[in-house]
Amino acid sequence: MKIELVTHKTGEQIPMMLDASGMPVVLPNEFILARRSLSTNTLVRNLRELSVLYRWLDKSNCDLSAKLLAQNSFNEAELKGGLVEALRVDQSNGRISAVAPNTFNQRLTTTRQFISWCMDVLISQLPLSSLDYERLRERKSFLLKTLDGSFMSATPMRKSLRKGLNEAEIDFLLEVLHPEAEQGFGRDSAVKLRNYVSVGLMLFCGLRPGELLSLRVEDIQFGAISAIKVERRPADPLDVRRPRPQIKRNGRVIPIENKQLVFTLNEYIVTWREVLESKSQDESDYLILSDEGCLCRNPQLHSFFSCCDRNMLIIFLTT
């Protein structure tokens, strides 16, 4: 089974499951279309979880719809001794081992939801006078009850206290990233200013990486009380980033209370962002651009923070 991400003309991205011959697998793809309001990453994960189910069905030479409708459908031994055990196995990287309890529970949850949806579809296709209505309702109840009894108790995870940066660490980070700092890093002034603005927006406005990379220039509002507008928009067909940055929280307006950040942000938009954009042939409305003037991607942002971590440690040890 293979998962392909299809980008439509509207910019919407919907994953699709393909079989070994490259043809779409009908039922899981229809199931995903019914859940298209969820994020693309969630839909991709759901299809990967269902691909485990379909590999087991292929290995058992079983057609799901026919089996669900048959007089002799799945019994408890087939479900618990076959399907559930297949969901426990991790076959990535050529190794066969058990997946973590949380991963198994996610697979089982998606499989349960999918089978419930399949049974609802099959029942809805019956004529009103059909004698199979009650039989299929009882079968659905049996299948779901059997799967419900297979969930694992997740092992308690070792929870370490997550520490945010204290005031001294924030001051040190901003001092290192300041565009005029001697020890700052960045290939030119435009990159240094972009780095400072990116970190400042995340520190003082609480933005997530996906929210930062989704910001457009028009979302920055300068005035007596400067603010940024975080807005969930329809998919942008011109956004070629894979995966696309996503805004998972509700839209909101966040005041920018740090005067230095407001001044630097204005300078970046008026002067230095155009310098970055001139390095690329493509124009963009997005606020944060890469060193080459293209749309900045999540891996590039993560790489920047890793670079920050290493450089800050070196500067701290040498000062």
Language-model regions: role of each:
Residues 142-178, 239-259, 280-282:
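DNA breakage-rejoining catalytic core of tyrosine-based enzymes
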Residues 168, 175-209:
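Basic, Lys/Arg- and aromatic-enriched nucleic-acid-binding interface segment
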Residues 214-264:
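Conserved tyrosine-mediated DNA breakage-rejoining catalytic core shared by Y-recombinases
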Residues 5-29, 33-47, 97-108, 188-193, ...:
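Short, low-complexity cationic-aromatic patches
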Residues 257-319:
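Active-site/catalytic core of tyrosine-dependent DNA strand-transfer enzymes
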Residues 8-13, 23-34, 50-54, 110-117, ...:
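Short, structured motif recognition centered on aromatic/hydrophobic residues
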Residues 121-125, 202-227:
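Short, charged phosphate-coordinating catalytic segments
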Residues 27-43, 50-147, 180-185:
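N-terminal core-binding DNA-recognition domain of tyrosine recombinases/integrases
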